[in-house]
């Protein structure tokens, strides 16, 4: 009798049929039960399917020419840098596909094509990286190198960079492990000199060493809530071997290092040193030796085999950026006013003046939006309430503040 009562009270998994004494735990649902073993099996099936989906997406990576075509829709100028990035990104994801499909007996080990982008503020480094990630539909995260500190010091651990990527990937580890991370302002953590310092370098060489580990490929322990690690915290294991790292910085003054090197070599051969007018010409001549002299450790340089030098944008470049890309600023403001049934026009001289202001402020393309915001503030405030206005024309005088925009009414 007691045995039958016990069987009546026994709970069974609705999927595998095991009872509560045969498994660690059984979870009750609406008219159904599931044991911990079936939960683990379901998680494994889902994980495998997600990996297959990620690999399937990456198997259709656009060719370099196709990537360049995509970049040209959004990014003006920087043709050499765009070509270098297109090739590096294509080779990176081709390497992943090759690694996942090759036979175990093959001994070819393709190294990662991590990228170092060097160029002045506002030249498009971050935007290039963002556009590439968007075109490939892979998770993308941005980190500021100046916020990072060596382990044991107050500040942000390098592992928190990986946490940002995980968050963008909705904590899908497999997707995150094939994402792109852009580390900005790497030049700001350069060593102060080529000589090894006796004192601790909290935000310089120590951070470079910490970055080196995750850039070259390692299994990192990432705190899911961010912040500092502590023994009681459960960690997420992230393998960085297939994460593409794009590292960028302005490297102000590196052209002087290039000039010095080129001058010494020319004199050594008994030739006259030919002066180059623009610093951008020197930027195209940068080699690993110059970057090391600037203060980046040679081990980190070795893990960034692709150099992409971006040039200072000219007034003509900035004017094209204002009106040509698919998401150009002029098009954005025209769209905003169109919602109020108002057309917006910029005179050519107005666009030139906006570009000139950005050059004067040394903000490059990054500063264009703030200049347009200043110019358009009164228009955006007043025009929506003026029902008879049908067209707004922005002139050079509007931009330099000497006159108001021209309004045409119905």
Curated annotation (Swiss-Prot):
The keyword Methyltransferase does not apply. SMART domains: AAA, ClpB_D2-small, zf-C4_ClpX. ATP binds at residues 120-127. Residues 1-54 form the ClpX-type ZB domain. GO terms for molecular function: ATP binding; ATP hydrolysis activity; ATP-dependent protein folding chaperone; protein dimerization activity; unfolded protein binding; zinc ion binding. PROSITE patterns: CLPX_ZB. Zn(2+) binds at residues 13, 16, 35, 38. Coiled coil: none annotated. Keywords: ATP-binding, Chaperone, Metal-binding, Nucleotide-binding, Zinc. One of its GO terms (biological process) is cell division. ATP-dependent specificity component of the Clp protease. It directs the protease to specific substrates. Can perform chaperone functions in the absence of ClpP. This is ATP-dependent Clp protease ATP-binding subunit ClpX. It comes from Streptococcus pneumoniae serotype 19F (strain G54). The gene is clpX.
């Amino acid at each position: 009798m007691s045995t039958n009562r016990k069987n009546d009270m026994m709970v069974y998994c609705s999927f595998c049929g095991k009872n509560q004494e045969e498994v660690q735990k059984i979870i009750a649902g609406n008219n159904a039960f599931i044991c911990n073993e079936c939960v683990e099996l379901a998680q494994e099936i889902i994980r495998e399917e997600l990996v297959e989906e990620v690999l399937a997406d990456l198997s259709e990576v656009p060719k370099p020419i196709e990537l360049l075509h995509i970049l040209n829709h959004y990014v003006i100028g920087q043709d050499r840098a765009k070509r270098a990035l297109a090739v590096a990104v294509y080779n990176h994801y081709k390497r992943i596909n090759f690694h996942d499909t090759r036979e175990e007996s093959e001994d070819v080990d393709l190294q990662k094509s991590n990228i170092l982008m060097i160029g002045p503020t506002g030249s498009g480094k971050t935007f290039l990286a963002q556009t590439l990630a968007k075109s490939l539909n892979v998770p993308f995260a941005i980190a500021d190198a100046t916020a990072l500190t060596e382990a044991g010091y107050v500040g942000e651990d390098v592992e928190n960079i990986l946490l940002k990527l995980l968050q963008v990937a909705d904590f899908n580890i497999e997707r995150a492990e094939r994402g792109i991370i852009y580390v900005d302002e790497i030049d700001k953590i350069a060593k102060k000199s080529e000589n090894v310092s006796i004192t601790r370098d909290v935000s310089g060489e120590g951070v470079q060493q910490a970055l080196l580990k995750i850039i070259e490929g390692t299994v990192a322990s990432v705190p899911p809530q961010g912040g500092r690690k502590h023994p009681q915290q459960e960690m997420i294991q992230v393998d960085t071997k297939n994460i593409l790292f794009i590292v960028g910085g302005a490297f102000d003054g590196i052209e002087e290092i290039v000039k010095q090197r080129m001058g010494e070599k020319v004199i050594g051969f008994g030739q006259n040193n030919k002066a180059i007018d623009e610093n951008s010409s020197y930027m195209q001549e940068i080699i690993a030796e110059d970057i090391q002299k600037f203060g980046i450790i040679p081990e980190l340089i070795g893990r960034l085999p692709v150099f992409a030098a971006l040039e200072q944008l000219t007034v003509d470049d900035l004017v094209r950026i204002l009106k040509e890309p698919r998401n150009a600023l002029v098009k954005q403001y025209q769209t905003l006013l169109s919602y109020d049934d108002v057309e917006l026009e910029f005179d050519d001289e107005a666009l030139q003046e906006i570009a000139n202001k950005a050059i004067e402020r040394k903000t490059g393309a990054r500063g264009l939006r703030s200049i347009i915001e200043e110019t358009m503030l009164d228009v955006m405030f007043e025009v929506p309430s003026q029902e008879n206005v049908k067209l707004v024309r922005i002139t050079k005088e509007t931009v330099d503040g000497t006159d108001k925009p021209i309004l045409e009414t119905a």
